[in-house]
Amino acid sequence: MSASVFIERRKIRPLRTEAACIPTHALCFNVLGIPYMDPGNGGIRPLNPDDSDATACVHGVAYLLTSDDLKKVILSEGGGIAYQVARLNAKLLLDDSPIVVDTLIGRHNVDASNERLPSARYIGVLTRGANELNLPLSYQRRLAEQPIYQPKSGWWFQLGVALFLWPWTRAAIITERLVYKHQGPDGHVPAWFLFIFDCLLWLMWAQHDYIHGPIFGRGDGR
């Protein structure tokens, strides 16, 4: 949502930019990241029909993109390893006019009870983007009040963090390079790549949940 990330870092040039919301969906953090670093990444899930809070639906920015820039977006978000494209109904905040958007939702349907907390860095990107877009203050407050993962102090916990992140951050770097190597025409990686990635993802989180977390302290805010 932050222009500094979307436009400057990813070198994407939108043809049009508009603040928008998706009335049927809410922001969530159901995309598993890396424990101790970015445990929960942003996604969206259907709103509870009983939720009447106007700030509950997800707000953000709608970009009009070329097909090449859409491919860049997909690649920058992992080539389909974490997200899949979904077509949803949205509305522009300027005049409430309806539009249809292609957005990214989590590839795995992680239950709300199993979501992990986002990092302070991750929420910082969202809050800066919301401020840049002048999104409703009520929604900005909602982002500011979002609970975040807060690392513990102490040498034992920090030792655990270092031991855990040393192999898994390197695995993430290699995965990112392989995504670009094996990308398809639309920016997505093939099914065999997704299978291997999923095995590594579940292995990483199993190590955290059943070995590392109990010994050194959890790295997901739960």
Curated annotation (Swiss-Prot):
Catalytic activity: an alpha-(gamma-L-glutamyl)-L-amino acid = 5-oxo-L-proline + an L-alpha-amino acid
Keyword Lipoprotein set for record: no
Triggers of expression: Expression is positively regulated by the thioclapurine cluster-specific transcription factor tcpZ.
EC number of the protein: 4.3.2.9
Localization terms from the record: Membrane
Entry's transmembrane regions: 154-174, 187-207
Name of the protein: Gamma-glutamyl cyclotransferase gliK
GO MF annotation terms: gamma-glutamylcyclotransferase activity
Protein family membership: Belongs to the class-I pyridoxal-phosphate-dependent aminotransferase family.
Membrane topology: Multi-pass membrane protein
Keyword presence, Thylakoid: no
Keywords: Lyase, Membrane, Transmembrane, Transmembrane helix
Function: Gamma-glutamyl cyclotransferase; part of the gene cluster that mediates the biosynthesis of an unusual class of epipolythiodioxopiperazines (ETPs) lacking the reactive thiol group important for toxicity. Firstly, L-tyrosine is prenylated by tcpD, before undergoing condensation with L-glycine in a reaction catalyzed by the NRPS tcpP leading to the diketopiperazine (DKP) backbone. Afterwards the alpha-carbon of tyrosine is oxidized by the cytochrome P450 tcpC to form a hydroxyl group.
Source organism of this protein record: Claviceps purpurea (strain 20.1)
GO cellular component: membrane
Pathway linked to the protein: Secondary metabolite biosynthesis
